[in-house]
Amino acid sequence: VIIDEAQRMRPEQFNKYTEEIGTLNIKCIFSYDEKQYLSDNEKEYNLKKRIEEELSCTPYILTNKIRTNKEIAFFIKQLFDSQTNIPGITYPHIELTYCKDYFSAKILLQTLLNEGWEIPSYTPGTRSIFDYEKYFPSNKMCAHSVIGQEFNNVAIVIDEHFKYTKNGKLTASNQYYSQRQMLYQIITRARKRLHIIVVNNASMLARCIEILNK
């Protein structure tokens, strides 16, 4: 049995699966990345710890994501940690555009969508309307629906809710779904080209320019 995205299981699911696996006396492979959570609940479940401490298993660690090329991987690493700097890298397949407001961002995103770019949105709310729903074009692709997929050309949005903590870690205003984690989920879908749209956020624009010009 192979359970992919195991870090997103609920505790009751983990209990049920492990009980059935033990009863049937079969082998199971849990594939997980503790960084790939979308809500704070998934982080608090800490399934990685339960898998490694409660089960008789041998963890194997993959050093790099297979789907992501080094250029994009280096950019992501520096974007999510402003204290990480990797000099001597060129980024010919990463584009950067700044929009001063949601209206211009929505126009640009629709243009990119028409040109064949994949634009997974941040997951919309079920009871509330979040700010990011105002600029994404109408499409059915969101952070939750693209889990496990990959695309050649991906466009992402970094709006005014993103900033760095005092220790340099990227963060965002928390909703029910973590916007920071949704960004990580979306940006790691890119296989060949990445287009970053920064909206009304001068400090994040400066960081992106700093990375691209190293």
What do the predicted segments below correspond to?
Residues V1-N114, S121-K214:
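Conserved helicase motor core of SF1/SF2 NTP-dependent helicases
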